[in-house]
Amino acid sequence: ADAPTAFNQCKACHSIEAGKNGVGPSLSGAYGRKVGLAPNYKYSAAHLASGMTIDEAMLTNYLANPKATIPGNKMGASFGGLKKPEDVKAVIEYLKTVK
């Protein structure tokens, strides 16, 4: 699937290539796994302690407001969230296809 335009904001820090971390972890295969499992990426203590699974419910909240969803995480410090619900939905649907 082609990435939605809203994913351009994600690409500033995240790769979709397995094992290729940037400022943020690779998003390859992220959908459906527990937070904090991308190999060779140093997660914040907040992310590791969250115990969350990266699924539709989590991403709906997290992509709109990362700071409130996982207080103290790195992403929330620099990214305020996607403002349009349709952008959040488009990015979630795209992440479901990124293996």
Swiss-Prot record:
InterPro entries: Cyt_c-like_dom, Cyt_c-like_dom_sf, Cyt_c_1A/1B. It comes from the Bacteria. Binds 1 heme c group covalently per subunit. Heme c binds at residues 10, 13-14, 75. One of its GO terms (biological process) is photosynthesis. GO terms for molecular function: electron transfer activity; heme binding; metal ion binding. Cytochrome c2 is found mainly in purple, non-sulfur, photosynthetic bacteria where it functions as the electron donor to the oxidized bacteriochlorophyll in the photophosphorylation pathway. However, it may also have a role in the respiratory chain and is found in some non-photosynthetic bacteria. PANTHER family: CYTOCHROME C. This is Cytochrome c2 iso-1. It comes from Magnetospirillum fulvum (Rhodospirillum fulvum). The lineage of its organism: Bacteria, Pseudomonadati, Pseudomonadota, Alphaproteobacteria, Rhodospirillales.
